[in-house]
Amino acid sequence: CIRDSIQSESGNQPDIIWVHHEKPGSIGVDDVREQVIGDMQIKPYSSRYKIYIIDEAEKLTQQAQNALLKTIEEPPAYGIIILLTTNADTFLQTILSRCVRLDFRPLRDTLVTQYLQEKYDLTDYECRFATAFAQGKIGRAVTIATSKEFAQLKEEVMHVIRYAKEMTTAEIMAEVKNIANYKLTIDDYLDLMAMWYRDVLVFKSTKDSNALIFKDEMSLLAEQAKNCSYEGLEDILKSIDKVKLRLKANVNFDLVIELLIMAIKEAM
């Protein structure tokens, strides 16, 4: 009905539940039990259905997926669970076999930016940065734009980018230990780093700042574009890709990150 649509648009529809998680890198069993399994025992307040939306569902731990399995197998007639993900391969086969898969196309960047501008008190730069990183996923864009954890992650990445060239061996080892605190969000860490060096490469090639993502760091970006060769920038981007592959193959985390920082230091 019209009332439900208005409530849904404003975020006040009690029968549409967005599942939140405290840890930025994972959705744990307690999150699932409290916000889905337990809550689903309560019938809808005003609607025919009660809908649970788990964004970034690829972050569900194995324990959380197992806890969710019985509810997915035998939900109440009014219960609907929507798992939003960019990587269905992270789900247990028992989960996948009990779900209906629907593929969504990414939203246009203009729509994501417009949504952020209308719904949140953000600068134009913050909206455009979140949009660029989210790649058409509006929920992801909201998380990036509003999460203190993501802002801190970005600062950690920028610290390495600023100072890798001057780091001593001891400082590199200390930084590796610091980055280990971000194991659960290492993909975001590496993606941010790759975005930076792509910006440097683009600016070095074109001297055009309009297409850049890190516009708030123009002086540093221009300096690195001037001082680093094309080959050096390409080597850094290749090193980041290698890190992702090695981590998926369970190569030692500290060793892989140490080699990455050393590659950046040598290239700069």
Model-found features: residue ranges?
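Charged, glycine-rich active-site and insertion segments that engage polyanionic ligands
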Residues: 6-7, 77-78, 87-192, 196-268
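Conserved catalytic/switch belt of AAA+ P-loop NTPases
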Residues: 66-83
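Clamp-loader machinery-focused feature within the broader ASCE/P-loop NTPase space
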Residues: 3-63
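Short, glycine/charged-enriched secondary-structure capping and boundary segments
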Residues: 31-34, 66-69, 95-98
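Helical "lid/switch" subdomain of P-loop NTPase nucleotide-binding domains
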Residues: 52, 56, 60, 64, ...
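Structural signal for conserved beta-strand scaffold positions within catalytic alpha/beta enzyme cores
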Residues: 18, 83, 101-103
